[in-house]
Amino acid sequence: MRLILLSGLLLLGTFLVNGHDADPEGEVLNSVLLTLMKLQKEFTNLFHAFLTVHKARSFGSGSERLYVSNKEIKNFEALKVICKQAGGQIPSPQLENQNKAFANVLERHNKEAFLVVGDSGNFTNWAAGQPNKADGTCVKADKQGFWHSTSCDDNLLVVCEFYFI
């Protein structure tokens, strides 16, 4: 989309620099301006459509964060790479509604998944007897959203967190 807009601006700039001799009626200039206005309107419509979908997803989960699984089963190190490549991060719920949205994904897939709790602020959701470093230095969430210490070598459901706006 940006490439098209930049191309239109380049064409418009070239036209203005070269003068109006090649297009005395201004047809090319009007055509370029009309195309740019259509593209701007289309971009605005796409942006509003994106916001509508985002708001609907947020409304349904009660969270401004989106938790998504690719259904793969991986260890913590592989999860870091996958989430980064996808443009997301390892889940780090900082509020109860975010943890619930995360737990909904786990319940739907009937699996457990890693999360990061170091930057979870004041919110925690440790299971009884947890954290227990003897179980491992990583943290997983069960299907109910309770947190447990676990080994980073465990293979769990890949879930990444995406934060919009």
Swiss-Prot record:
**What family is this protein classified in?**
Belongs to the alpha-type phospholipase A2 inhibitor family.
State how it assembles. Homotrimer; non-covalently linked.
- Compartments, as annotated in UniProt: Secreted
**Residue ranges of every copy of the C-type lectin domain listed in the record:** 46-161
One Gene Ontology CC term in the entry:
extracellular region
Protein name in the entry: Phospholipase A2 inhibitor B4
> At the top level of its lineage, which domain of life is listed?
Eukaryota
Renumbered to this chain, the signal peptide range is 1-19
Which pairs of positions does the record mark as disulfide bonds? Answer: 83-160, 138-152
Q: Which residues are glycosylated?
A: 122
Q: Name one GO molecular function term.
A: carbohydrate binding
Major localisation: secreted
Q: In which tissues does this protein get expressed?
A: Expressed by the liver.
Which Pfam families does the protein's record reference? Lectin_C
Look up and give the organism this protein is from: Crotalus durissus terrificus (South American rattlesnake)
Describe the function of this protein.
Answer: This phospholipase A2 inhibitor binds directly phospholipase A2 in the presence or absence of calcium.
Q: Which UniProt keywords apply?
A: Calcium, Disulfide bond, Glycoprotein, Lectin, Phospholipase A2 inhibitor, Secreted, Signal
PROSITE patterns linked: C_TYPE_LECTIN_1 (PS00615), C_TYPE_LECTIN_2 (PS50041)
